[in-house]
Amino acid sequence: MAPITLSTIDGKLKDIIQHLFEIQSAVHGYLGPETQQELVRKIKNLTTALQTLSLHTRDDPTASTTAPNQYQSTNPNDPALHSIALPPEIIDYVDAARNPDIYTREFVELVQRGNQDLKGKKEAFADFRDVLAREMRSAMPELRGEVDKVIQATGGKKQSERERG
């Protein structure tokens, strides 16, 4: 059986929304027994659509015993449903009736702060490396070549390059 893709589920959800809209319209224009059969038919259609969605989104009991490539889709823009993993925090946000975009924004801000901290540490270590190299060159001139090799290996510039630029 081919994997159920995200676009398939998207289509099923759109169908359900359409059924709900039709039911809303039928209830709004309810005229009594003459429109009752139409309303019953629309509710049955909604029930069928919900059952189909439930079947498509049910956890696959064979997932743990099958190969990992089973859920790969041929279209990377339309992944298989069971290959998508959402962070539990996003699900908690939605369960709490919060906007998942807030979680995304907070997560991005947290990552940016962490990156700034790491950048600061990297620059501090680079400055320390340069100060240490300068002091080692002046204290032990015979190690100048080895110090330059270490500086170059750790991403710094040799003393001669720093003096030019």
Curated annotation (Swiss-Prot):
Region (Disordered): 54-81, 143-165
Main subcellular location of this protein, as a coarse class: nucleus
Keywords: Activator, Nucleus, Transcription, Transcription regulation
Transmembrane segments: none
CC terms in the record's Gene Ontology section: mediator complex
InterPro entries documented for this protein: Mediator_Med10
Polar residues compositional bias, start-end: 62-77
Superkingdom, natural source: Eukaryota
Protein's UniProt keywords contain Nucleotide-binding: no
Pfam families: Med10 (PF09748)
Location in or out of the cell: Nucleus
GO biological process terms, semicolon-separated: regulation of transcription by RNA polymerase II
Gene Ontology MF, one: transcription coregulator activity
Function: Component of the Mediator complex, a coactivator involved in the regulated transcription of nearly all RNA polymerase II-dependent genes. Mediator functions as a bridge to convey information from gene-specific regulatory proteins to the basal RNA polymerase II transcription machinery. Mediator is recruited to promoters by direct interactions with regulatory proteins and serves as a scaffold for the assembly of a functional preinitiation complex with RNA polymerase II and the general transcription factors.
Family: Belongs to the Mediator complex subunit 10 family.
Oligomer and partners: Component of the Mediator complex.
Protein name in UniProt: Mediator of RNA polymerase II transcription subunit 10
Naturally occurring in which organism (per UniProt): Emericella nidulans (strain FGSC A4 / ATCC 38163 / CBS 112.46 / NRRL 194 / M139)
